[in-house]
């Protein structure tokens, strides 16, 4: 998508969801601000680096990159480690960017809400360290604000990282309690069965991706996704409103 943001600059912003190597230079022609989001695919790291290499080549100096929280901590999770490699490239090559680092998306619950209601369990193995899940709508709004901030600035702005988290840090039992309240009957958290989790995922995704997700879940349990002090306040200041809560999201998708 291309759009004009500011009459003074008459510039264009490129939203890039997938990368076609042969058309990168054409796609980036005349673009001043880039939003880079790469799918979880086997060559995600290569795609991201090539996109940024071409962006640097054509002179794009305003970038917003969607990474992931704790990319530097979850070193054995492929789609986390790849994103951290991209972050390192951005920093060491001196690119002017906002790196957004979202936690686990609340929106993933869409895929398991029927299982929760049907079997009376919360099946995601998220453990008891705590996960600060965030609504994708909040991610999108913050990303848009950062794109506009960079696009309309007088010059390229320095590198910054923003953790994107929800207002509550919830454990597996906490989430089960939320669903119990929303559904009006008991929902339990059965604990972690990583082998079973991987096997279930292999029914609808490639085996390499299922293992990637299993290893991620194992790190949920050992490390959690806990925000840093001040993260929630920073986001609510940016948005000018409270972050969306997990309970409200669960109630919404139940209908």
Predicted regions and their residues:
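Oxidoreductase cofactor-interface core, primarily capturing Rossmann-like NAD(P)-dependent enzymes
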Residues: 1, 29-31, 40-42, 49, ...
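NAD(P)-binding Rossmann-fold cofactor-contacting core
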Residues: 1-7
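A hydrophobic C-terminal alpha-helical subdomain
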Residues: 155-157, 195-255
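Structural motif corresponding to alpha-helix initiation and N-cap regions
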Residues: 18-21, 45, 49, 194
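Conserved Rossmann-fold cofactor-binding substructure of NAD(P)-dependent oxidoreductases
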Residues: 7-32
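Residues lining the SAM
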Residues: 37, 66, 240
